[in-house]
Amino acid sequence: MQSIFGTDGIRGRFNEEITYSLAYKVGYALGSTLEKEKPILIGRDTRISGDILLQAITRGLNESGKKFINLGICPTPAIPYLIKQENLSSGIMISASHNPPEYNGIKIFDHSGQKITKHFENKIQKLIEELNQNISVPRKVIPLNKNKDLMDIYIKSLIQTMGGENLSGLKIILDTCHGSATTCAKKIFQYLGADVKVINNSKNGLKINMNCGSTNLEPLKKALIESPAHMGFSFDGDADRVIGIDSKGNVLDGDHILFLWGRELMEQKILTNNLLISTQMANLGFEKAWEKIGGILYRTDVGDKYVRDAIKEKRAVLGGEQSGHILSKINNFSGDGILTALQICKYCKKKNINLNDWLKSSFEPFPQKLTNINLDFNINKLNPKTKILIDQTIENFQAIYSDNCRVYIRPSGTEPVMRVLVEAKNHDKVNSLSSEITKKLFSEINKIIN
């Protein structure tokens, strides 16, 4: 059996890769592994399939003898925060993050609120393989009570990160993308005194991430034109990432957030070794600008768990991804889109600067193009020999083009696509090289497969 775990837990299309039977087995395997006294915390995003998977996981936990607490619809970062705060045994988030509504996934956190290790994934996988019978969906759905008190604890913790700073005088637009941020983002910003407008704010799981959210900024840009505001923030489906937009429509992505936040910490002399952790997707313009002011950028493979591992190894205090996952010491290095947005607002207020001017003081990104090559298969589930051939082909492409620009190619850990990133000093070069590389790479991969 191929590993069910990808770069960010288990993920796939509901009723294909992610089924009721698999979710039950995950619950049973996890419940059988953990100590019985402390309960496990479970949350989900707004996807329609989330309730079915929740039923399956809790059934598995029950039959393994493990107690659980149902948080209901919540941001992913609420799970790791509350695990540590309430001394729980583990946590599960049912979400496919930024993926479309037909996808879902299962993220598992350990007793310290960190995503489980590869070793623990293998342990769960082995137990699941031993449960070889297919588990059918029961006719009767059992209602599950939600714990609202724990959600209030999480919300209060976010407010406390402001250190008494309020957001009065700031007009802010939030795109909650019909996802987890609908539960609390508006409430938090309003409590802090901001004038808040929210778009895509229904808990409609059929619309989650559809033409909205952190992977599609057009609705937020349009809203900022129609209702001028100081800034806007766009979250993904489970609210663990965020992208900002200033009053003039300029994008504040994860690279900009890391640069600006990192510079503040550097000036306060609390940024260890002036080090930031990011990934291979980080813009070259960001890296050069950061080095120019005396900083060091350490790159990891793509995925917030790799960023977190490097933060721990290098004893860094801040890291993240261009996509808007920002991991800071404030929240035990768990990506939290709402917390990140609050910190941006806090710095703007404390410095008495608008986001547009603050963004201008960061860096000019190199032209960058990310292209997805759609495949008929998940490259991570191929046999080892075929995967090695494809990996060698990728390395060859990166070596050939390294003199002209920066090329980074990787298979997605969650979807059947190959991602090709090309950076150069001008747009024409980026576009021509991207087109050339994707065509050749697609051809080479097909030769290997066929």
Swiss-Prot record:
Its cofactor is Mg(2+). Keywords: Isomerase, Magnesium, Metal-binding, Phosphoprotein. GO terms for cellular component: cytosol. Gene3D superfamilies: Alpha-D-Glucose-1,6-Bisphosphate, subunit A, domain 3, Alpha-D-phosphohexomutase, C-terminal domain. It catalyses: alpha-D-glucosamine 1-phosphate = D-glucosamine 6-phosphate. Disulfide bonds: none annotated. HAMAP family: GlmM_B. NCBIfam families: glmM. This is Phosphoglucosamine mutase. It comes from Prochlorococcus marinus (strain MIT 9215). The gene is glmM.
